[in-house]
Amino acid sequence: MKTIEVDDELYSYIASHTKHIGESASDILRRMLKFSAASQPAAPVTKEVRVASPAIVEAKPVKTIKDKVRAMRELLLSDEYAEQKRAVNRFMLLLSTLYSLDAQAFAEATESLHGRTRVYFAADEQTLLKNGNQTKPKHVPGTPYWVITNTNTGRKCSMIEHIMQSMQFPAELIEKVCGTI
């Protein structure tokens, strides 16, 4: 998979055509351009072009804090989120979304997140079970992480709050998100 850098205006336009949480930019562009994975490109046009020097573009996924805030607000307003009847399901959906927005920042936030006697996040279920048989570890969908789920809602809110603060979300959004768990 290749990555390209686009300006904020174009990114916002593409992101505004998102149909569901987690939809990739490739899926959005394919839909917008009515281009399927199976379709073949038209016959190539050959034309000699002289390039003074090769253009090297380091492509980076660009997600500004504004884009992350928008994604979280969209999640809170989504039918998928509203349909979650249990706090643990909303918690898991929030974790998946935060990871999808910035996996590196999520990883850094979870490394520093643990209790006095408990580990909250791990790469496997056994690590969490070593810290207590009653931790009810669950795999966070779309991530390599497992999380303990037998905590009360307040602790789940604290965990989300820590991750979102570490990922530099605005305080009012963090408060709003925690109020929905």
Swiss-Prot record:
<dbReference type="Pfam" id="PF03925">
    <property type="entry name" value="SeqA"/>
</dbReference>
<dbReference type="GO" id="GO:0005829">
    <property type="term" value="C:cytosol"/>
</dbReference>
<dbReference type="InterPro" id="IPR033761">
    <property type="entry name" value="SeqA_N"/>
</dbReference>
<dbReference type="InterPro" id="IPR026577">
    <property type="entry name" value="SeqA_DNA-bd_C"/>
</dbReference>
<feature type="region of interest" description="Interaction with DNA">
    <location>
        <begin position="116"/>
        <end position="120"/>
    </location>
</feature>
<dbReference type="GO" id="GO:0090143">
    <property type="term" value="P:nucleoid organization"/>
</dbReference>
<dbReference type="GO" id="GO:0032991">
    <property type="term" value="C:protein-containing complex"/>
</dbReference>
<dbReference type="GO" id="GO:0044729">
    <property type="term" value="F:hemi-methylated DNA-binding"/>
</dbReference>
<keyword id="KW-0238">DNA-binding</keyword>
<dbReference type="InterPro" id="IPR013321">
    <property type="entry name" value="Arc_rbn_hlx_hlx"/>
</dbReference>
<keyword id="KW-0963">Cytoplasm</keyword>
<dbReference type="InterPro" id="IPR010985">
    <property type="entry name" value="Ribbon_hlx_hlx"/>
</dbReference>
<dbReference type="GO" id="GO:0006355">
    <property type="term" value="P:regulation of DNA-templated transcription"/>
</dbReference>
<dbReference type="InterPro" id="IPR036835">
    <property type="entry name" value="SeqA_DNA-bd_C_sf"/>
</dbReference>
<feature type="region of interest" description="Interaction with DNA">
    <location>
        <begin position="87"/>
        <end position="88"/>
    </location>
</feature>
<dbReference type="GO" id="GO:1990097">
    <property type="term" value="C:SeqA-DNA complex"/>
</dbReference>
<dbReference type="InterPro" id="IPR005621">
    <property type="entry name" value="SeqA"/>
</dbReference>
<comment type="similarity">
    <text>Belongs to the SeqA family.</text>
</comment>
<protein>
    <recommendedName>
        <fullName>Negative modulator of initiation of replication</fullName>
    </recommendedName>
</protein>
<comment type="function">
    <text>Negative regulator of replication initiation, which contributes to regulation of DNA replication and ensures that replication initiation occurs exactly once per chromosome per cell cycle. Binds to pairs of hemimethylated GATC sequences in the oriC region, thus preventing assembly of replication proteins and re-initiation at newly replicated origins. Repression is relieved when the region becomes fully methylated. Can also bind to hemimethylated GATC sequences outside of oriC region. Binds, with less affinity, to fully methylated GATC sites and affects timing of replication.</text>
</comment>
<dbReference type="GO" id="GO:0042802">
    <property type="term" value="F:identical protein binding"/>
</dbReference>
<dbReference type="GO" id="GO:0032297">
    <property type="term" value="P:negative regulation of DNA-templated DNA replication initiation"/>
</dbReference>
<comment type="subunit">
    <text>Homodimer. Polymerizes to form helical filaments. Dimerization is sufficient for DNA-binding, but oligomerization is essential for function.</text>
</comment>
<feature type="region of interest" description="Interaction with DNA">
    <location>
        <begin position="150"/>
        <end position="156"/>
    </location>
</feature>
<dbReference type="GO" id="GO:0042803">
    <property type="term" value="F:protein homodimerization activity"/>
</dbReference>
<dbReference type="GO" id="GO:0009314">
    <property type="term" value="P:response to radiation"/>
</dbReference>
<dbReference type="GO" id="GO:0007062">
    <property type="term" value="P:sister chromatid cohesion"/>
</dbReference>
<dbReference type="Pfam" id="PF17206">
    <property type="entry name" value="SeqA_N"/>
</dbReference>
<keyword id="KW-0236">DNA replication inhibitor</keyword>
<dbReference type="GO" id="GO:0003688">
    <property type="term" value="F:DNA replication origin binding"/>
</dbReference>
<dbReference type="GO" id="GO:0010385">
    <property type="term" value="F:double-stranded methylated DNA binding"/>
</dbReference>
